[in-house]
Amino acid sequence: MAVTVKLMALTVSFFGLLSFILGVIAENKKPPAGTPVFGKDGVTCKFPADPTVALGYLSVIFLIASTVVGYLSLFYPYKGKTVPQGVLFKSTTFAVFFNVALFSTGLAATMLLWPTITEHLHLKRNVHLDLTYTCPTAKTGLFGGGAFLSLDSSLFWLVALLVADNAREDFLDEDKDDKLDVELPSLANHADMVI
């Protein structure tokens, strides 16, 4: 099966949508707080079993997959025809969407990793010497915000792919026209010589 723009677009969309869904589920499954168990020397936090940390890491993994496929799809030589990167970046629209896709990917990764790592640390370091410790969990809303940014990121990669495809077609059409212009005068001169 040949790699096409449509296949790459579907792959980017699939990974981006999966990252979004996992991030939203992680937000919904996150417990509001742990239960403090008071001991003689401190507080031990008991947290209910939930898949928040695993879902957060999976969401980040699929965000990375969407980004890698999105980035590679922009510069892939479809039908064996390569286009210089400089040609793509001459398009202002492509440059804008490329940079916005990179920025939104970084922001999405930050907003997904921050609560995931925080929640992971809360689960691992659950003994505290402070008797007033309330056993908090990661901030509410970060998983959801990161999930929506992950979806936005994949959409920006798709738009950049569409703009890159248009720039690629324009470049290849211009290249084809230049070859025809070069060949036609040489044929006319050859015809004059034969007569």
Predicted regions and their residues:
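Juxtamembrane membrane-interface segments at transmembrane-helix boundaries in membrane proteins
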Residues: M1-A2, V37-G56, P84-V96, V127-G145
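Alpha-helical transmembrane segments of multi-pass membrane proteins
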Residues: M8-A26, L55-T67, S91-T118, K139-W157
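Extracellular/luminal ectodomains of secreted and membrane glycoproteins with large N-terminal domains
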Residues: L17, E27, P31-F38, G106, ...
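Beta-strand cores of modular interaction/reader domains in eukaryotic scaffold and signaling proteins
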Residues: G56, G70, T134-P136, L162, ...
